[in-house]
């Protein structure tokens, strides 16, 4: 299975992050998303040391409130923490809505980068999503879009997007779009997101269930 299953780790303290990371690894995660914005006092945490201590593939994310995150500091502080994480994380995720200069600073420092777009209100048209993805890939290695469907047809737009674009993570959120987190693997998505009971986005399924369902659906080599 080429699609990596990523489990987000969203905790208030560094020890809790380390503990949850261990449980996610034991549960079968291929990669972890460390949500810096979940930390109560991220400025007091040595982000580099935290990621190195975990010793497992990591996506470092410091999600802005505009796109569903919880970071309460300034934008400058948010970017500085991402820059610190970029030195040791396998991937760094930065939002397309960030200032272009900040995106270029972060992606330029990262080993590999994800430029992401989140829309919790609706699913833009396929044409609009294609423009978003191509813009994201001009600056990052992987584009990520996560959008909210109003009907089943909206969920199909997300899968259709994956037929046009490689190096793209595309997610239809919520209960309606839950199946796309599994189906995306059939369309070549490099990463899909699962949880350990407490998801960080609507529609995330348990990591074990996600792996089994992808295994059942993927054709034999």
UniProtKB/Swiss-Prot annotation:
The reaction(s) this protein catalyses: 3-dehydroquinate = 3-dehydroshikimate + H2O
Record: residues binding 3-dehydroquinate: 33-35, 63, 181, 200, 204
Assembly and binders: Homodimer.
Organism: Methanothermobacter thermautotrophicus (strain ATCC 29096 / DSM 1053 / JCM 10044 / NBRC 100330 / Delta H)
GO biological process: 3,4-dihydroxybenzoate biosynthetic process; amino acid biosynthetic process; aromatic amino acid family biosynthetic process; chorismate biosynthetic process
Pfam families hit by this protein: DHquinase_I
Active site: 118 (proton donor/acceptor), 144 (schiff-base intermediate with substrate)
CDD domains tied to this protein: DHQase_I
Function: Involved in the third step of the chorismate pathway, which leads to the biosynthesis of aromatic amino acids. Catalyzes the cis-dehydration of 3-dehydroquinate (DHQ) and introduces the first double bond of the aromatic ring to yield 3-dehydroshikimate.
GO MF annotations, alphabetized: 3-dehydroquinate dehydratase activity
Protein name: 3-dehydroquinate dehydratase
């Amino acid at each position: 299975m080429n699609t990596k299953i990523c489990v987000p780790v969203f905790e208030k303290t560094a020890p809790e992050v380390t503990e949850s990371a261990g449980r996610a690894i034991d549960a079968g995660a291929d990669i972890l998303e460390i949500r810096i914005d979940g930390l109560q006092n991220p400025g007091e945490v040595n982000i580099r040391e935290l990621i190195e201590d975990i010793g497992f593939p990591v996506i470092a994310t410091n999600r802005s409130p505009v796109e569903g995150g919880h970071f309460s500091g300034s934008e400058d502080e948010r970017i500085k923490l991402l820059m610190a994480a970029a030195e040791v994380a396998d991937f760094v995720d930065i939002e397309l809505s960030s200032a272009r200069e900040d995106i270029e600073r972060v992606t330029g420092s990262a080993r590999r980068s994800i430029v992401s777009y989140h829309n919790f209100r609706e699913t833009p048209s396929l044409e609009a999503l294609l423009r978003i993805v191509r813009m994201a890939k001009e600056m990052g290695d992987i584009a990520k879009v996560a959008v909210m469907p109003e009907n089943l047809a909206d969920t199909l737009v997300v899968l259709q997007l994956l037929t046009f674009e490689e190096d793209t993570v595309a997610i239809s959120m919520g209960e309606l779009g839950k199946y796309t987190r599994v189906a995306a693997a059939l369309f070549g998505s490099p990463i899909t997101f699962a949880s350990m009971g407490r998801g960080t986005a609507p529609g995330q399924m348990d990591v074990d269930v996600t792996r089994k369902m992808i295994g059942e659906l993927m054709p034999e080599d």
